[in-house]
Amino acid sequence: MPNAAAAQRRHLIPFAAVSASYFAHIGFFNPYLPLWLKELGFGLVAISILTSVQAATRLFAPYGWGWLSDHTGERVKLLRYGATMALVCACILFFDLGPLGLGLVLLVMFTHTSSMMPMSEAAMAHLVSQGGAFDAKRYGRVRLCGSLGFLVTVFLAGAWFEHFGMKHFPGWTVLSLAAVTASVWWLPDLKEAVPTQEIKLSVGPVLKQQPVLWFFITAFFHVLSHIGVYVFFSLYLDALGYSKVWIGMLWAVSVIVEIIWFFTQAKWMPKLPLTAWLVVCSAAMTLRMGVTAQWADVLWVLLLAQALHALTFAANHTVCIALLSHHFPGRLRGRGQALYTVIAYGFPGVLGGLLGGLMSDRWGLQSVYWVSMCTAAIATAAAYKVWRLQHPKQKAAGLA
């Protein structure tokens, strides 16, 4: 057993590198892409459309990649292909592209990067669930590396862009995706067995289960509430007069509390059933968006709102991955992760990005956060429904 545990740890180290490099890429790309597009001369509506391309690819790419990975067992080889193609696309950002050309490059790049976390999470969930139960402690340690990567680049990029301007954004993109590609090629070439009797397993019967259906409704509205942060937060702070350094620092606060949560979550998670955590996380999101809408110009209040990210993202993410691993085991795991990406990030990303752009253009960026507060309240109600449906079953299933 000690040898098996040591082998599992060795296998998880490359996954930690993938998590660190991928979220290092996200740490500068997502916060500063809108500001780069703004410097290129695009208006709010055009920026919202271009930033929504990433979410649009999550409507089809994750499930396609998930289907391939489930039916071939070759998650690692597919990850390597996706990372390499994304790096090639990033090199094209150096050229002077019009809105259509830029949109096309982003479409191809995001089609390949959008597959990376679902497949990586599925492969990692397989490793940390081999004892029969989801190991939140080991998962948290690996995911913590991603948060550290995000933290480093959001700090460095903010200072860099403040001093040198946004013209170096394509260079940062290429360097970060080169790191992702290198780390993906370091992954052990583990192929999951594909038993012929399991190939025809369908996700349909799982989706018809009431707790699963309400779980996805919760995930949809919870992440829809986050779009105000993912797409418009940097623009909102910029409009309020915050410098790029302070924008980076405010992003960093959310990542620091995220790191603390991932490092200590094994201590806190057993205190409540997983579905009860869903309720807590969405309720915290309702509070966070309301505070951001009303008091974003008060620094210390905004800092406290950002600190709620420990619950609204970190805790929520771990709970969702654990529930997915429970409801979509074995050969269903890749498609379960992909469905989560499509429903929780694809549709909300497209709707939130496009509607948020229209709202902010008409009523100002603050309006996005008031609407986000309302969608978070809907997520809270849906999470409560999940808890009511599943709570009696959780202790027996090892999910309490």
Language-model segments: what does each one mean?
Residues P2-R9, L187-A219:
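Juxtamembrane intracellular "pre-TM" segments in multi-pass secondary transporters
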Residues A5-A55, V212-L250:
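Helix-loop boundary and gating motifs at the non-cytosolic
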Residues A20, C89, P99-M117, F220, ...:
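Hydrophobic core of transmembrane alpha-helices in multi-pass small-molecule transporters
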Residues L37-K38, L68-S69, L144, A159-E162, ...:
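Interfacial helix-cap and linker-helix signal at transmembrane-aqueous boundaries
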Residues F60-E74, F161-E162, I260-P273, S360-D361:
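Helix-to-loop junctions at the C-terminal end of transmembrane segments
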Residues K77-C91, A276-V291:
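Structural signature of the two symmetry-related core transmembrane helices
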Residues L107-C145:
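Cytoplasmic helix-loop-helix junction between adjacent transmembrane helices
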Residues A159-L175, L358-A376:
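A membrane-interface helix-boundary motif in multi-pass transporters
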